[in-house]
């Protein structure tokens, strides 16, 4: 059509990011308003997000073979269809306490406990950003994989991460959020480290599958924890704050991971990212037990029936 300067493309991407995160947060907030178990609902969101991420790259690659702009046209058409479907959803608009960008700060001040899932969300997305860039470079430069092999290894993570989120979300409705979030994060961090120390590509693939399953254990429980804590009239603000911290974590994983890998080593980068997950699990454990949410719901239910 006409040449666009690189700065213009970056500006367009910035606007696209604003629109995307806004629609994404509102879509998840709509699920927060539904009954039937917050873990199940957040697992549904995670299933959709994970499948989209897992299928986006291979489908985009096939469409690119038809032409460089075909993936963009197809994505625009898919987003338009999603927007039309969104008009059919039942909307719930309770009176909100505040609609300003600083509402997140006010919500955190009133409900300090939201900082706990926000912190977990930051570190969880940090690992995702880390694998998106540093993991890809590591697989190709250190393991000698080509683009197809790298895609298979990333798929070993994304497929179980997507498919297990719904059952893991339902599990958190039964056993509570604390066990999946704390124990899951601890095991998840160790699994991330195991990817580097895997002695072969096959073992690396197994480690990536384990990372995906454990990530699916943590992700819906963390989002459900936000839903459990947030007041009914501030769920949108709470989920928006969660996504802000998550996006900052994703960016930190890319920039921080690349910096450590470039200046120190891949081993140091994997250790820092994995131990960050372990650290947040250990440090936040006392805070998790102080939250006003059931630790083990089935035991508390039995005690109420006595």
Each PLM stretch: what is its role?
Residues 133-148:
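Short amphipathic helix-loop junctions that connect adjacent transmembrane helices
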Residues 1, 179-194:
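Structural signature of the two symmetry-related core transmembrane helices
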Residues 12-51, 224-225:
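Cytoplasmic helix-loop-helix junction between adjacent transmembrane helices
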Residues 234-264:
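A late C-terminal transmembrane helix in Major Facilitator Superfamily
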Residues 44-88, 267:
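Helix-loop-helix hairpin linking two adjacent transmembrane segments in secondary transporters
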Residues 77-95, 280-288:
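C-terminal membrane-cytosol helix-exit motif in multi-pass small-molecule transporters
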Residues 90-120, 300-306:
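Juxtamembrane intracellular "pre-TM" segments in multi-pass secondary transporters
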Residues 7-22, 122, 203-217:
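Hydrophobic core of transmembrane alpha-helices in multi-pass small-molecule transporters
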